[in-house]
Each structure stands twice: as C-alpha cells, then as structure tokens.
Amino acid sequence: MDNPLYYVGIDIAKAKFDVAVKLQNGKHKHKVFKNNPEGFQTLMQWLNTFGETFHCVMEATNIYHEALADFLFQQQITVSVINPKCSANFTKTDNLRSKTDKIDAKMLADYADEKRHKLPIYQPISPAQRELLRKNRQLDHLKKQLAQEKTRLTMLVDSDCIASTQQMIVFIKAQIKALEKTIKQCVNADNTLKNNVKLLCTIPAIGFATAVQLIAHLGDGNRFKNAKAAATFAGLTPMIKSSGKSLNTVIGISKIGQSDIRKALFCPAMNFAFGCYKNSVYRSFVLRLLECGKPKMVIITALMRKLVTIAQAVLQKQTAFNLDTFMK
C-alpha cells in the first residue's frame, strides 16, 4: 500500500497528552506532547514522519480534548471522540492488567483498529453551540449545588452554620437566575439557535430549558445522520442480551451516551406519560405499551427516546412539530 492508514490513540489530560501510533507490524510508537497549540504543531510534525493518512481516537474528557480534536479536524485528519465507557469495556475484554497513560494511548489505537467501521466521525460544533453547552453545564452544576445546600440545611443545628448555609442558598439562587438570563440572551443573539429553540418548543413536553439542553448536545440537526443515531448518542437505545435460551432479550437501555439529555427528558416524559399531562398527544403511544404489560419506567424511557427522535427529526427537517408527520 502506497499510503497506509495509521490508527492513532490519544490519551489526553489537562496539561499533556500521550500518543500511540499503531504501525503496520502491530507494534506502537509512543510520545508525549504538551496540551497547547505548540504541542499540537509538534504532534503534526511527528505524525508526518509516519505517513499522510491517520485516524485519531480520543476519549471525551471534560473539555480537555476539544482544542486538539478541533485542531486535527482543521488539519483534515479523521478524528473520533468516543465515550470512555466504550474504551473501558474494550480494556476488560483485552485483559489489560495495568493502567498508565502510555498503555491507555496504545489501547485506544488498538480500539480504533478493531472498531474501524463503527467509529463515530468527529464534527466540531459551532462557537454559539459550544458557548450554550458550557453555560448549560454551569447551570446544571449550580442546581446540584443548590440541592446539596438545601439538604445540608435540614441537618444543621448550629445557628451560625444555619445562617451561613441560608446565605449560600440565596447566593446560588441569584447565580442561577443570572445565568438563566444569560442563556436566554445567548439564544436570542443567534438566529439559528433562536429558530431551533422555537421549533423544539412546538413539541409537546419540550419547554425552553429542555430545548436548550437538547440543542446544546444535538446541534442543528446535522450532527447525526438520523434519529436512531441521536438516540444512541443519548444512551436511550435498548440493551439486548442473547445467551443460551434467552435470545434477544431487552434488559434495559445502554446508558452509554449523554446523561444530560436523559436527565433533561425524564421529568417531561414522566409528566406526559403518567402525570398531569397524561391525556396528551402521546396517550395512544403510552396505552399501547401499557397493554403490552410494560412497567412504568420502561414506558417513561420509551417516551424519552421518542422525544429525542422527534427532536432530531424536527431539527433535521427544520419543521415545527406536526401530529400526522411525527407521531405515525
């Protein structure tokens, strides 16, 4: 082969990243680089000593992978950003007994080679979507803090500690209110975001906050090729078990996906399945599952998946929700 394809595993951290290139003979070449623009350029110089065609694989690690993934994409290198759970399962099947950054980089290169036809191809999100995603994550963090402080308040007896915690609760509430206002301004300042939020809000069970969460992760509808891919990304696809006489038994959902989407959709799905909005457009869908003897949690999860697939279709088609089109 004149121009062989090299699989590259990248184990990335805050300050540096380990890179392992899998050679044609199955061995690996390893090197460490700084996680900054200078390190990215040095990486490119090193990769060019092997060839011209690469497929780089890295795990989604907070925000540490984003700059490098964007840089490699700009260099026209194929990049895959995978869920850490996928590589963790691969590590177990590969019987790796040690765990170091170097070993992890080699493992990711092997993972890329073995799963070459199933790897998701990385597409950078727009600056507006990235800003929305980061603000939304901060909002989720503040809400968790607020819940924790409220729980602590019920366990305190010292008056000074109670007063301190109450002040903290007031402060966090103010921060949440200010950030929610900023998120609305962020949406209104971008015509694409504004239009997509408006479209998603036409879906029963989807309000502004849920629409923002969905757009922050799903994008404008072009990130995934179809609704099934979006549901897979959200970790809402069925997990099938096939062993012995138990063939193709559904044992739950995969949960290998974006948990923020599942959290955002749980309450809306619960309310529209069994709560105050149970006589909604989803009633026939829910009744059909009840008649099949499905438990409540299974039905709620199924409706969550339904909402994701509808949201993806609405964004992809750039069409408002229509009962005849989206509930066939």
PLM features: what roles do these ranges have?
Residues K14, N62, C86, A216:
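Short, glycine/acidic-enriched loop or turn micro-motifs at the edges of active sites
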Residues E291-K328:
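Basic, amphipathic alpha-helical segments enriched in Lys/Arg and hydrophobic/aromatic residues
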Residues A13-E38:
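Short glycine-rich, Thr/Ser-proximal phosphate-binding strand/loop in the N-terminal lobe
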Residues F208, L214-C292, K296, K328:
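Phosphate-backbone recognition surface of nucleic-acid-processing proteins
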Residues S80-L199:
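Long, charge-rich intrinsically disordered scaffolds of nucleic-acid metabolism proteins
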Residues T53-Y64:
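Short glycine-rich phosphate-binding loop at a beta-alpha junction
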Residues D2-K22, L108:
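Gly/Thr-rich phosphate-binding beta-strand-loop-beta motif of the actin/hexokinase/Hsp70
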Residues E38-H55:
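Short, basic/hydrophobic alpha-helical segments
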